[in-house]
Design a protein with these regions (language model features):
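Cell-envelope/glycan interface and biosynthesis
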Residues: 1-140
Length: 141
């Protein structure tokens, strides 16, 4: 992809903005059913896996979340929320993640970008507010 803006938006479909990953809060995890993984297989965290070898696990997890038995864990990357692709394997512990969401400072992140040698830096600096509206803030629950 030659256009830096298009490149950034394509990457953000599956990857967080640098410094804005919910995993960095320490409250979010990616989860799979290890007992379903064939020997030698490397998990890719894809929709195909969720609808294949991990389907029984994700069906069970969906039932637990929907019935309020998930102990504060929720799926944040779901269809129709923001522009990131759904990630049924990604769970957030909301009681703690909400604390970090309140402390998140977009201007601080912008300052870090301005001082860092990072690919597509101009796009990130010029469009960070709009990118955050699509790729960060929709997932703050």
């Amino acid at each position: 992809i030659d256009d830096p803006e298009e490149l950034v938006k394509t990457i953000l479909i599956w990857s967080a903005l640098p410094g804005a990953s919910r995993h960095h809060f320490g409250t979010d995890i990616d989860i799979v059913d290890a007992s379903s993984i064939p020997e030698g297989y490397e998990v890719q965290l894809t929709p195909e896996e969720c609808n294949g070898m991990f389907k029984p696990f994700h069906d069970w997890l969906t039932r637990e979340i929907e019935s309020g038995n998930s102990f504060g864990f929720e799926r944040v990357f779901i269809p129709g929320r923001g522009k990131i692709q759904p990630e049924p394997w990604h769970l957030s512990y909301l009681p703690a993640s909400r604390i970090f969401q309140k402390e998140f400072n977009l201007q601080l992140l912008k300052g870090l970008y301005s001082e860092t040698d990072i690919a597509c830096k101009e796009v990130l600096l010029d469009q960070l507010d709009d990118l955050a509206k699509d790729y960060i803030f929709p997932y703050f629950l």
